[in-house]
């Protein structure tokens, strides 16, 4: 409850009385709603597409890996409000704050990872590390936000080099196969 724009009290569920506008106003954030922030892409629900598709946002999704490759990552961050007072009064733009923290955290984790790990078996580890970093950033800001999940939607090489990347992968598989055949022949 705000009185003349200044925080006065937090009320509990049930019957509560407050002085009518313009003296007191009540802010009621949805603390049970799970919010979703998409990074690297915009879905139909975000941008008003009628085609049912998604639009890529390269300035958010292109990241440099630890082995100096570029990877295109789309991911979603799911979050809830854990402290309504902090959420309403400690940060001005909660969604912008979550987005900035998520981009920063993912770039930090990707910069420490190799491209092979990012594209194959390391996704769960990357998601967990990213979630921990986002939460620590939001806790530093006293935001009142709890990150519940980070979910990688897509992780691919950029479109311009995807064919060359697949050729390299096929060559590595052929090398492994030839090596295994040679070892089998030697035994």
Kindly label every feature range from the protein language model.
Residues 1-110:
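Hydrophobic membrane-anchoring helix/hairpin
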Residues 86-91, 127-128, 159-161:
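Solvent-exposed, non-transmembrane alpha-helical starts
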């Amino acid at each position: 409850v705000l009185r003349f724009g200044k925080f006065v009290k937090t009320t509990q569920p049930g019957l509560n009385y407050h002085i009518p506008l313009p003296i007191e106003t009540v802010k009621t954030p949805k603390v049970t709603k799970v919010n979703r922030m998409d990074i690297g892409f915009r879905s139909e629900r975000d941008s008003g597409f009628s085609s049912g598709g998604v639009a890529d946002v390269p300035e958010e999704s292109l990241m440099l890996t630890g082995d100096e490759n570029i990877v295109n990552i789309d991911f979603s961050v799911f979050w809830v409000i854990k402290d309504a007072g902090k959420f309403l009064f400690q940060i001005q733009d909660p969604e912008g704050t979550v987005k900035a923290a998520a981009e920063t955290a993912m770039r930090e984790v990707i910069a420490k990872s190799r491209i092979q790990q990012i594209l194959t078996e390391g996704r769960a580890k990357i998601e967990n590390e990213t979630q921990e970093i986002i939460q620590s950033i939001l806790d530093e800001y006293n935001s009142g936000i709890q990150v519940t999940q980070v979910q990688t939607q897509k992780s691919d090489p950029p479109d311009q080099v995807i064919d060359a990347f697949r050729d390299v992968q096929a060559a590595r598989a052929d090398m492994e196969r030839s090596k295994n055949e040679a070892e089998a022949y030697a035994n």
